[in-house]
């Protein structure tokens, strides 16, 4: 158990010292989206899915926003510059915003 706490402590200290502020902000957004998805799932289990289209739209939107944010984090990470050589962080953010607009238009259309 002591080894686990030392591993967690080392991970946290490395994260705080070595992670850029931009990535920390994306991580906070990812945590918020994850919490929103968990709340929607618990609500579905406790109360039900009526109206089903609204629940499905909300849950699909949450999962899709999480996936888009992970893609943004991968593109904005300075350690991944060799993988995304032709894409600047600004271009990655613009792609993220464009994909969010399209996603929310589709979700609003699905709700009816």
From Swiss-Prot:
Belongs to the DAD/OST2 family. Disruption phenotype: Lethal. RNAi-mediated knockdown in the wing results in a moderate decrease in wing size, decreased N-glycosylation, increased cell-death mediated by the JNK pathway and increased ER stress mediated by the unfolded protein response pathway. The chain crosses the membrane at residues 28-48, 52-72, 92-112. InterPro entries: DAD/Ost2 (IPR003038). Keywords: Apoptosis, Endoplasmic reticulum, Membrane, Transmembrane, Transmembrane helix. The keyword S-adenosyl-L-methionine does not apply. Residues 49-51 are lumenal. GO terms for cellular component: endomembrane system; endoplasmic reticulum membrane; oligosaccharyltransferase complex. It comes from the Eukaryota. This is Dolichyl-diphosphooligosaccharide--protein glycosyltransferase subunit DAD1. The gene is Dad1. It is a multi-pass membrane protein. Pathway: Protein modification; protein glycosylation. GO terms for biological process: apoptotic process; protein N-linked glycosylation. Residues 1-27, 73-91 are cytoplasmic. Component of the oligosaccharyltransferase (OST) complex. Subunit of the oligosaccharyl transferase (OST) complex that catalyzes the initial transfer of a defined glycan (Glc(3)Man(9)GlcNAc(2) in eukaryotes) from the lipid carrier dolichol-pyrophosphate to an asparagine residue within an Asn-X-Ser/Thr consensus motif in nascent polypeptide chains, the first step in protein N-glycosylation. N-glycosylation occurs cotranslationally and the complex associates with the Sec61 complex at the channel-forming translocon complex that mediates protein translocation across the endoplasmic reticulum (ER). All subunits are required for a maximal enzyme activity. It is found in: Endoplasmic reticulum membrane.
